[in-house]
Amino acid sequence: MSEDIFDAIIVGAGLAGSVAALVLAREGAQVLVIERGNSAGAKNVTGGRLYAHSLERIIPGFADQAPIERMITHEKLAFMTDNGAMTIDYCNGEDASASQVSYSVLRSKFDAWLMEQAEEAGAQLITGIRVDNVVQRDGKVVGVEADGDILEAKVVILADGVNSLLAEKLGMAKRVEASHVAVGVKELIELPKSVIEDRFQLQGNEGAACLFAGAPTDGLMGGGFLYTNETTLSLGLVCGLHHLKDAKKSVPQMLEDFKQHPAVAPLIAGGKLVEYAAHVVPEAGMNMQPELVGDGVLIAGDAAGMCMNLGFTIRGMDLAISAGEAAAKTVLSAMKRDDFSKQSLGEYRQHLDEGPMRDMRMYQKLPAFLDNPRMFTAYPEMAVSIARDLFTVDGSAPVPMRKKILRHAKKVGFINLMKDGLKGVTVL
């Protein structure tokens, strides 16, 4: 190899890019990571939950050294109206293996740590530089243009986030449709460690993950989230971009109203706002995926649409990590063959099919199922109304619970209930 040519150039030092760099560098590959932010993770925004299985496979016992916040042991799923909420609460008190747990994380700290692992293995990192173009020669990607310089590589891995302009320039991705992404806003609210543990009934490093549907996004597709960190709360909401044209409130106003909701306000009372961030996040999964493989190029992470919104949980970080690992394995195999053609790099799809694509394929119809206004208006209202009737005792003549439930179900419509229920069964 010429000293002027890297084995791989990775655009983006997020989870997919950092993991790809780590796996490649461990095997002696000459790797350069280019990050436009001032540090790894500086441009990344997420609610904050990492399912450990994918990174545990790459760095066994990573939680003992990584800057994780809390291990999630408490789950809450709330259906909200403007002034009420019906919440499903689950607590896992059983011992779980290292690959079965999940953690709340702060990406600015966690991504920086993960990139440090790649650098210690031999990868090189350049920050504060934007990649302007991907360089092609005879139809094959041979490097990138960054800050006026041409940097060459045998393969380029694009892990530059949702709405990858580089993938679009290569003709591997179409312009992102509004229906495929959502706008996410997040606040980091500081509270004493003991206060967080008291309010969420936590002990030690236990953590809580809370998702909210209905009122947080003013009845539009999306929802609110709250994750407990060690001394902060990650609070925010996500709303489908294509629905915002119908919104009666701005996203900042939605967030402010969410914070004032009686089910949320007591949890954040007395907290200090220490950070605010906004980001565009992928929502459509496989329905928005670009062409993942080209001559001399692979696409991974958010740039490849690696995200799953299942309603009851949201996954993205573990999928990005698996995609980064798959990309690295593919490049290592191609290096042995000295063949970086599209056909040779097609092995990437095989690795993905054994991991993230398997899960994404199973739930690929779910985004369309959730894109139903009743999910965020009629059903939260029905759930809260039934709960209110169940727990209200006012001395009046009792009404059988089945009649109360039927009364509220009629408001949704029995045909709608059957239609949505049948569709849900086929999707899930």
From Swiss-Prot:
Pfam family, one: FAD_binding_3
Cofactor(s), names only, from the UniProt record: FAD
Gene Ontology MF annotations: FAD binding; oxidoreductase activity
SUPFAM superfamilies found in the cross-reference section: FAD-linked reductases, C-terminal domain (SSF54373), FAD/NAD(P)-binding domain (SSF51905)
InterPro entries assigned to the protein according to its UniProt record, in alphabetical order: FAD-bd (IPR002938), FAD/NAD-bd_sf (IPR036188), FixC-like (IPR039651)
Keywords recorded for this protein, A-Z: Electron transport, FAD, Flavoprotein, Oxidoreductase, Transport
UniProt key word Oxidoreductase: yes
Source species, domain of life: Bacteria
Biological role: Could be part of an electron transfer system required for anaerobic carnitine reduction.
Family note: Belongs to the ETF-QO/FixC family.
Name listed for the protein in its UniProt record: Protein FixC
